[in-house]
Amino acid sequence: MDWRVGEITAFSAAYNKAIECLARGPKSTKDLTRWLHQREHAREDVEATIERLTERGLLNDAQYAEIFARTRATTRGMSRRRIAAELAKRGVARELADAAIAEVMSDENIDERAIVEAAAAKKFRSFAKLDADVQRRRLYGFLARKGFAPDLVRETVQRLTRP
């Protein structure tokens, strides 16, 4: 690419802003691109910045997906489906997301059944004074919104709401 002084300055501004953004935490390529566009950097400068960061290993969607999946699965008790949906929203390729989720689930010995049981038991306590049908309906909705598989949700709700 043939650079002029003004173009180098504009590129440097975009690059420096991207570095500042990444210093606060990892980002996906799509998130960082969107963030730079919101700060009104030229498309060419954003593309060159993304390319340079990727070449230098500072922007890596596979690494981002693993970090994201690990924090969501271990600290927030999210399901595989919910993590995959969140990563897709952030522009991470499905293959990268699936690989990262599988790696995290096996590395951390995470059992999705245990996650759903813990989340359901915790939430169920807040429904103690409600009618049994209302308890079932609310618990099912809560677990479904967390992204757990319908069969697993149904089984867990039945087990917890059994008289």
What do the PLM-derived regions correspond to, one by one?
Residues 1-163:
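An alpha-helical, amphipathic repeat domain used for nucleic-acid recognition
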